[in-house]
Structures are given as C-alpha cells and as structure tokens.
C-alpha cells in the first residue's frame, strides 16, 4: 500500500518544509518535491495544513482497577479516542496487581487487555508496588522483553519508602531502564486530608487544599536527591502541576543531572476554580489543579524548554461513578480526567496558534522527545525515511468547539466542554493506514502492535 501526502508543510522537531511525503508498506520512504510513486497509490491533499509525526502519549491509564472502581475506557475506546485526536502511539501505566505479585504478572494481564482491542501501537510502563529480591532480579528480564521504564509511587496504597526507592533506582539504572515517579508527600497529604474530614469539609475544593503544591514539590526535590545518591540514576517526573517543582528540576538540570519532566494540558489550561463549580467532582485528580500563577510558570517551562513532554494522564471515571462512590466526599472520589483525544489539538491551539511555541517545539513535546526518552526513536516521533508512517494532519484554518458528544472515549463528560480550539485534526494515519478522517473513525480494534522498546539512552541535555 502506498500513500502520498502532497502540498502540506512537513514538520519535525528540527525543522519544517513544504514537501510531499511518501509512505509505502507502512514506512516513510521519501520526502521531497513532486514525488511520483509507482501506481497504485492513495493521494492525500494537505494544502494549507501541517503534517506532523503522529502523537506519542506516554501517560495513559486504560482499563485500570483502582480498587473502588475500574476506569471506563478499555484499550479499544481509549486508543480509539487517541487516534481521533492525532495520537498514534501510547505507553500505558499498568495498574497495581494483587499483593505480592511479580512484575510479569501485570505485564501478562495488560498484554491480554490490549492484544485484541488496541487501535494504535502501544507499550507499557512497569509498576513497582513493592520491593524484594524477586522483584529486583526480575527487572533486567522485563527490560529485555521491551519494557524499559518503570513507575514508582510516593503516595497511594503501594507507595515506596526512601530505602525502597533507592533500591529501585539503583536496579533500574543498572538494567538500562528509566525511573518514572508520581511525586507527592503522602504523609503530609494524609495529615491535611484528616483535618478537613474531621471538620466536615469534604467538598471538591478541599481535594486541592489537602494536596498543596508543596507536597508535590517536596517529593520532587526528594526524588532528585535520591536519584543522585543512587549513582546519578535517570529520573522522569510525571504530571508536573506547579512552578516550585519546576524550579527544583531546573536546578538539577543546571547541575547536569539526568532528569526530565512532563506536564499535561489540564495543568496548563484548567485551574482550581473548577472545584467551586456545580460539577466540581469531575475535576478530582492528583496532583490537583492549581491557580493561574502556576499555569503561567508551566507555560514558561513549555516555552523555554524546561518541560520536556506533554502527556495526558488519561484516566476516565464517569460522573455516575464519581457521584455514586464519593457521595459528596472528595476523599472517596476516584481520581483522573479524560483527555487523550484532546491533547494534540489543545496544545496546538493554545501553544502554536498563540505564538507561545513553534510547530517544531510542538513536535518535540508531543512526539519526538517522548519517543527518544522511552526507546521508540526513530521508529516513532519522526517523519524520515525508515520511520513508521504515523502522521497527523492539522488544518490551522479550522476552528472547533470541543463537545463531549463528538468525542470517542467512553466517558460521559469532558473537562474541556466548550473550549474553542483554533486548528483541527483532519486526518490520522497509523503505519500509513487512515484511522481517522474528517470526524470519522475508520480504524479497527486489534490492529495496534505491541512495541518492544529499546533500553534507555539519555537524550543530550
């Protein structure tokens, strides 16, 4: 199968040019002017549009069981939504398994979840929910099987203490894996939460007040120091929500420490005032939404290169689940927001179209750097001969208002309802196959492939 994309502006992280792009058998074969491929081929006219590498979202939670509820997106509805939003690769954070389970247990469970449902290519992050000799011995074998990143939690039920974190950091570093971490100070959160509950203060706004930015920033600083103690182990901070944590990361980077950081559209575009609305429970996530000042600090990091990746942390619970389980108490509400379908459009509209970032920086944040950090480059995140034919075409002339009824996930609401975006996703191709076109999903469940990722190699800081 041959596909020729003509008349568009092809953009990679290192530059852009108005040129044609030829995909053959799912692989980019040629870029240039006036390409004349052998017949037969499909021709796509991208006049006036940007032709970007397909998005790489390295932070999703599909089919996750958090104990009190299971998220309402599985690997079909979740990857369908991703495809319709221009994302062609996801790396899903595996959920916790039974007490004492091995790493392989969760890998086998999640490969079963995705195998016949995923629309786009996928991989997983391992999750380390406890430390013992068996887990430490298992890590190199899992890396050899293509999982080269693992997540640690400093909060929630399976949080690790500092000694366990050090053991994990050392072993992951030795094994060629990147450590990712959810950084919040669990003890401080528990203390604040208990105070509010004892006082009968359980409305959504107290979720944010119980998890102040200092809880997140302290944990970031602690992880930076522990990574240094563990032999300068590489570290990736997920879902950054505040400027103080970013300051600590800037300092570490200035000291040539191998640390990277992601943020998410919700921390760039939503703020804590959402908790005081009638539907405040729909915005419960951790870390919580912050104020506009923190948004501005994050946008500075987006613009100046201090932030490396924009992912989603897509974790969908319906309003029915939230209301039934929480019964008006923020501490009982399942955490997470939908967003995998909106990431590319939101960042393009609020970043590129406002002049905050260039189209090249957009590629860096949404596909190139995620692919580099997580062992997928140059197969993903790049439009060049030999790379996968993963493409998203965005028309900057079109304006769209986000409405839940037009989205493709399995949620019953969107936190982005009513947002007007300048720029529309008009087509998504995965390995040369159109899976979304002009508002219509055309992919199929099970066509996505499991990606064996290479061991971690740090990009140049």
UniProtKB/Swiss-Prot annotation:
Disulfide bonds: none annotated. Binds 2 divalent metal cations per subunit. Can use zinc, nickel, cobalt or manganese. It comes from the Bacteria. Keywords: Hydrolase, Metal-binding. Optimum pH is 8-8.5. A divalent metal cation 1 binds at residues 59, 61, 151, 313. Optimum temperature is 45-50 degrees Celsius. The keyword Hydrolase applies. A divalent metal cation 2 binds at residues 151, 182, 239. Catalyzes the stereospecific hydrolysis of the cyclic amide bond of D-hydantoin derivatives with an aromatic side chains at the 5'-position. Has no activity on dihydropyrimidines. The physiological function is unknown. This is D-phenylhydantoinase. The gene is hyuA.
